[in-house]
């Protein structure tokens, strides 16, 4: 299996990542998820987001999550890109993409990777609103989503 992980400040091209995931004739299914900066959270207008990470440890954690997905499903390619730094409302934050021979494996693996990324990868998120800024923790619903895979 081919999996690539990137933690970067730069934006990414969903089209380019899709092309890389879809290469070859074995991939009968390609599933992608793109997370974006919302303009509203907890009743407040969000104007931006600041993301920090633990260099080296974050990439290792993401690779481990990809390996766990590979152990559960027959995947051909996995791509995880997570941005750091300052972003504005509407900007792309994260891409998770997987290819597999079958759609069920591709859908499940993509969801698994995103659920584990939200709860296990060392990222810190500060939300900037029109009134103030605040650090955002993982939500209970994120942990519940990850627990269903255990």
Swiss-Prot record:
One Pfam family recorded for the sequence: MoaE
Single biological process term from Gene Ontology: Mo-molybdopterin cofactor biosynthetic process
Residues that coordinate or bind substrate: 36-38, 102-103, 118, 125-127
Enzyme Commission number: 2.8.1.12
Alphabetized InterPro entries for the sequence: MoaE_sf, Mopterin_biosynth_MoaE
Record keywords, A-Z: Molybdenum cofactor biosynthesis, Transferase
Gene Ontology terms for molecular function: molybdopterin synthase activity
Keyword Nucleotide-binding found: no
GO CC annotation, single: cytosol
Pathway(s) where this gene product acts: Cofactor biosynthesis; molybdopterin biosynthesis
Catalytic activity: 2 [molybdopterin-synthase sulfur-carrier protein]-C-terminal-Gly-aminoethanethioate + cyclic pyranopterin phosphate + H2O = molybdopterin + 2 [molybdopterin-synthase sulfur-carrier protein]-C-terminal Gly-Gly + 2 H(+)
Keyword Transferase listed: yes
Biological function: Converts molybdopterin precursor Z into molybdopterin. This requires the incorporation of two sulfur atoms into precursor Z to generate a dithiolene group. The sulfur is provided by MoaD.
PANTHER family per the UniProt record, alphabetical: MOLYBDOPTERIN SYNTHASE RELATED
Subunit structure and binding partners: Heterotetramer of 2 MoaD subunits and 2 MoaE subunits. Also stable as homodimer. The enzyme changes between these two forms during catalysis.
Family: Belongs to the MoaE family.
Name of the protein this chain belongs to: Molybdopterin synthase catalytic subunit
Organism encoding this protein: Vibrio cholerae serotype O1 (strain ATCC 39315 / El Tor Inaba N16961)
Organism lineage string: Bacteria, Pseudomonadati, Pseudomonadota, Gammaproteobacteria, Vibrionales
